[in-house]
């Protein structure tokens, strides 16, 4: 089971970066002039709906058959999805180049990722922010079910588990709708990220401090909504900081950084829950999340053009960032 989880995680890390890069390049090449937050927001709405349907259907199927059947169905759906993507997804705004030897390409890829990712301060600080947020977010979601059962006082109230999935899925849908509106309230994207990040930290601390089931439910709604609304804004900002030809690699590297944070953070918080309880583990998680806020501020201090301009417009008319890197380009 552990090996399967590792393989699924690796697949998601690489798949997420490539898909997002494909979307942004295609939008730039087709002359899209709208807000990129709204596009990512719509994608998140679809994800939320799918999560809601999948959670309900998965629970129903598992109850009628076995716990293994939903995993088999997930594998079948992924195979169908890959076939559909292979048939329908074509590169628009990006022309693949013929590669050389594998070792040479890997060295070039690593060098480009370091140069355009870690070598650009605004990108580097944003990636470090993800290290602290990613691990805490995953732990907070999976620990909610036993924590709420504990607060509810009935360890067999399995409907609570479904309630958690429904809350998070609903928050993804609402967050996708709210992201462009929240962004419009601020001149800079980092201002929106600082606000949502700071309030999320406070909400996590309250989730671990309030020993009332219904109050915690309300706080979970706020936390999940803020996390979901900030994601499209962060995606838009990050995409505007990196060139098209390196987009997929750097986005995958960013996803990997968040996963690496989870490797250290999740076991630590799990151990804290074993020793002190779920409530204190959420308070500790809030303290870890608070470490991400200074990195957003450091990224903000770089005054990158992507912090204020529309990313897709930047892809059409490149503007040079503080490190001499074009935020986006349709060249290959």
Residue map of PLM features:
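A membrane-interface helix-boundary motif in multi-pass transporters
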Residues: 60-76, 154-162, 270-289
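C-terminal ends and interior cores of transmembrane alpha-helices
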Residues: 1-3, 198-211, 297
């Amino acid at each position: 089971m552990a090996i399967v989880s590792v393989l699924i995680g690796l697949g998601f890390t690489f798949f997420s970066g490539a898909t997002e890069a494909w979307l942004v390049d295609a939008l730039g090449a087709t002359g899209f002039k709208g807000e990129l937050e709204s596009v990512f927001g719509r994608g998140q709405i679809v994800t939320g709906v799918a999560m809601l349907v999948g959670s309900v259907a998965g629970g129903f199927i598992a109850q009628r058959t076995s716990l293994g059947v939903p995993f088999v169905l997930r594998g079948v759906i992924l195979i169908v999805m890959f076939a559909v993507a292979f048939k329908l997804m074509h590169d628009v705004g990006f022309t693949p180049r013929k590669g050389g030897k594998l070792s040479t390409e890997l060295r070039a890829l690593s060098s480009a990722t370091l140069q355009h990712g870690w070598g650009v301060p605004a990108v580097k600080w944003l990636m470090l922010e993800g290290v602290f947020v990613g691990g805490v977010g995953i732990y907070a979601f999976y620990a909610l079910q036993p924590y709420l059962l504990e607060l509810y006082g009935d360890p067999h109230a399995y409907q609570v588990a479904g309630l958690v999935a429904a809350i998070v899925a609903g928050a993804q849908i609402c967050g996708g709708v709210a992201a462009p509106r929240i962004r419009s309230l601020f001149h800079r994207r980092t201002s929106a990220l600082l606000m949502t990040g700071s309030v999320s930290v406070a909400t996590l601390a309250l989730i671990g401090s309030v020993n009332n089931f219904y109050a915690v439910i309300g706080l979970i709604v706020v936390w999940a909504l803020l996390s979901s609304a900030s994601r499209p804004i962060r995606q838009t900002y990050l995409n505007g900081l990196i060139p098209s030809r390196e987009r997929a690699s750097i986005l995958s590297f960013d996803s990997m950084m968040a996963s690496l944070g989870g490797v250290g953070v999740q076991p630590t918080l799990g151990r804290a829950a074993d020793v002190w309880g779920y409530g204190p583990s959420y308070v500790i998680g809030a303290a870890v999340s608070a470490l991400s806020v200074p990195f957003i501020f450091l990224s903000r201090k770089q005054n990158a053009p992507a912090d204020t301009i529309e990313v897709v417009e930047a892809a059409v008319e490149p503007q040079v960032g503080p490190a001499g890197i074009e935020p986006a380009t349709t060249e290959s």
